[in-house]
Swiss-Prot record:
This is Uncharacterized protein CT_035. InterPro entries: Biotin-prot_ligase_N (IPR019197), Class_I_gatase-like (IPR029062), UCP016642 (IPR015834). Pfam families: BPL_N. It comes from Chlamydia trachomatis serovar D (strain ATCC VR-885 / DSM 19411 / UW-3/Cx). Belongs to the chlamydial CPn_0128/CT_035/TC_0305 family. It comes from the Bacteria.
Amino acid sequence: MKRILVYSDRGVSPYYLRHTVRWLKQVAAPFQMEVCRVNGRFLIHEPLWEETTQLLVIPGGADVPYHNVLHGLGTARIDNYVREGGCYLGICAGAYFGCAQFEFLEPTGSLFVAKRDLGFFPGAANGPVYESAFSYTSSSGVLAAPLVFADFPGESFSLFNGGCCFENAEHFPEICIEARYNNLLGKPAAIVSRRLDKGLVVLSGPHIEYLPEFCSLQEDNVIQAREQIAAHSSSLEEYKQFLIHRLLSNVVEHVLY
């Protein structure tokens, strides 16, 4: 039986990890797939994990610890896994981690620029794409980001907390733009996908895994975001169903937007 692996090592946010695992368990049930948390040692050293894995998810948190743990053999195995037919979903920090390079404006005001191994998106990820008060230790930067999707009409809101846009995504013919930020200048790419040999990669700046009904945080900005997402999520929910079907069955189908 195939499995879904969720990375849960240093740098992963416990809060977003819980949302990711809960969402995946909900949507994976019809596919009869087990959702398993794994650490970096597993991805680096476990023999043949690729053969039993349908989807690898790198959730939200902080990219630098991901790189410190997985750089080298870990990212080489992930890249090979995808090229041989596996699927990769990177959310927020997991999306930064999946890009060739990125720029991130730290809460201190300094600009962090880095290159990464995987390069699933061959360009640069830039963030946080909203100039909110992002913090590694609080929810001060949380907001509801309005998205428009390539294949689903209407506007939906998704949770945002420090995520990226994918710079000049339309200039890369191998990249499909799945969703755009609807209230930012130029409507930059918020979610992108790519066919890589036999595999499929999806990178999302916003937290599409977030389940508002399971959020109990009481900060005013979080409450406002939660209410917006709960009230305006029909296109997002349709997209997520479509997305999980593609990832768990590795279907070759999509259009450019």
